[in-house]
Amino acid sequence: MEQKYSLLSHNTFGIDVSAACFLEYASVDELRGLIGSGRVTSPYLHIGGGSNLLFTKDYEGTILHSRIGGVEVVAETDDDIVVRVGAGVVWDDFVDYCVQRHWYGVENLSLIPGEVGASAVQNIGAYGVEVKDLIVRVETLNIEGKEHVYDVTECGYSYRDSIFKRPENKSVFVTYVSFRLSKREHYTLDYGTIRRELEKYPGVTLDVVRRVIIAIREEKLPDPRVMGNAGSFFMNPIVGREQFEALQAEYPQMPFYEIDTDRVKIPAGWMIDQCGWKGKALGPAAVHDKQALVLVNRGGAKGADVIALSDAVRASVRAKFGIDIHPEVNFI
């Protein structure tokens, strides 16, 4: 247990705040022991890699962080494999582990920051793949020390959302996540950017796809170790068919992705760019010059600086397109 613990290394935005108390654990029994000892005082917050958080001030409570590790094969057939992964495993380390063993499914999620537990909370996704389509079950322990295993059908998954993000489940801590991966060669290569990059290689393999995804992300997204950020700051809005057609008539060059016959997803980054924000700064916070969906800490920014920029960007998009874009990042 550490008092007045700096959270600078526990949030990828690089916001310099502290927690009144910081507790780490490496097993379910350790977590249960911390809970039973009474050291987890309210308010409390469980964090992963801090890649989806924006701290707005010092946290006057207890921060919990998992170091539960391990990747265990729990079921296997000729076609697929189920692995149980500790919530504290770094997400990209897990992706690399799978690629090296020729397990298909997570390669498009390469280089996403954060940890495995948070992947199940956030329903991370990229390049046509969402983690909900790979998850089998999520194991948890609550603040009363009770374990519960959620089947994927109980997790309430939707775009960047799950029941674990609900306020009433704040006291539920993810301990393990089980994933089903394919042993048969299978890729999701629907995005034009991926297909264009793959043309540089003589053939498609898991390792090649991972390298391509990493190259694309590194070109568009800043390294949080160099420039603080939380990746995509805003969610891509989903609009109804009628609103989409009206916008398309006005902006025929607008990119879009069909969700179903009634709903269409519009890239928030494109709208932000159209509003002239790409590369623009507001104090020490800025919109990244290569990917307008990303807000960055140019150095010394506080949470309030990032929120002020976020509010200004949202107001511009609302005024120009009549669409509200919402932060993907959680404000603390």
Swiss-Prot record:
GO terms for biological process: cell division; cell wall organization; peptidoglycan biosynthetic process; regulation of cell shape. Its cofactor is FAD. Its EC number is 1.3.1.98. It catalyses: UDP-N-acetyl-alpha-D-muramate + NADP(+) = UDP-N-acetyl-3-O-(1-carboxyvinyl)-alpha-D-glucosamine + NADPH + H(+). It holds the Pfam family MurB_C. Its main location: cytoplasm. It is an enzyme of class 1 (oxidoreductase). InterPro entries: FAD-bd_PCMH, FAD-bd_PCMH-like_sf, FAD-bd_PCMH_sub1, FAD-bd_PCMH_sub2, MurB, MurB_C, MurB_C_sf, Oxid_FAD_bind_N. Gene3D superfamilies: 3.30.465.10, UDP-N-acetylenolpyruvoylglucosamine reductase, C-terminal domain (3.90.78.10), Uridine Diphospho-n-acetylenolpyruvylglucosamine Reductase, domain 2 (3.30.43.10). It comes from the Bacteria. The keyword Cytoplasm applies. Belongs to the MurB family. This is UDP-N-acetylenolpyruvoylglucosamine reductase. It comes from Bacteroides fragilis (strain YCH46). The gene is murB.
